[in-house]
Amino acid sequence: MALVGRYNSLQVVKHTNFGLYLDGGADGEILLPNRYIPKDIPSEDEDWLNVFIYLDSEDKLLATTEKPKVQVGEFASLKVVEVNSIGVFLDWGLPKDLLLPYSEEKRQMTAGDYCVVHVYLDKHTRRITATARLDRYLDKTPATYSPGQEVDLLVAEATDMGFKAIINNKHWGLIHKNEIFKFMRSGMREKGFIKEVRADGKISLSLQPVGQEAASSLSSKILGKLRENDGTLAVSDKSDPALISSLFGVSKGNFKKAIGSLYKEGKIVIHADRIELT
């Protein structure tokens, strides 16, 4: 049986004037239309092709070599292209737009909005469907991340405390406001770092390396910018936090620690209005 909403490796069983038929096992033969057959891939009988399986507008299984923006079981930020009496329709990179039923909305959507969704397969109809109700699809088992571990983040929701983000397509985490030193919005994908896994299971995140690695990374960044600017930067431990954030994406406190260490190592000189290489 083919995995609907996922990539499948299927064998070519028949050529026709309008496409190739692939062996879908218990689902029978699945059509790969001519328009989805690249000229540079083999397509002889018994060849195996890597294709994405979905339902067409008549709810028939169809194969494509086009790449959707998200597969079943994954989270993504998708653009609303239409809202009608049936529900909200999202652009996910395939000709047939993805349905987000009204019952799966968290807020009212209009065309042009972006929405972070999980994509699942309806058990009764096998239709690929989106939901904005994310909690039920995130892992509730205790996470085993280590402090400082690099992870993939999908920023999902702004809160009073910062931004909730999905970690490695599995867990909720929180980027606290004091860890954010650049523009952020829901739907952004970022590299992040585990700051803390609390006893209650909640996970704190950072957008910068943490611990000793963070200090080393920031020190290297400061030295790099100094070398790029003839050994001088018009920023110091007395500078406005906004200037420091715009230059290095860190808090003033972390910046002061870094230049203090560089000063002790004899690599820079600190003035009231600038720092210089020695």
Residue ranges and their predicted role:
Residues 1-278:
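Single-stranded RNA-binding regions, centering on S1/OB-family and related RNA-binding modules
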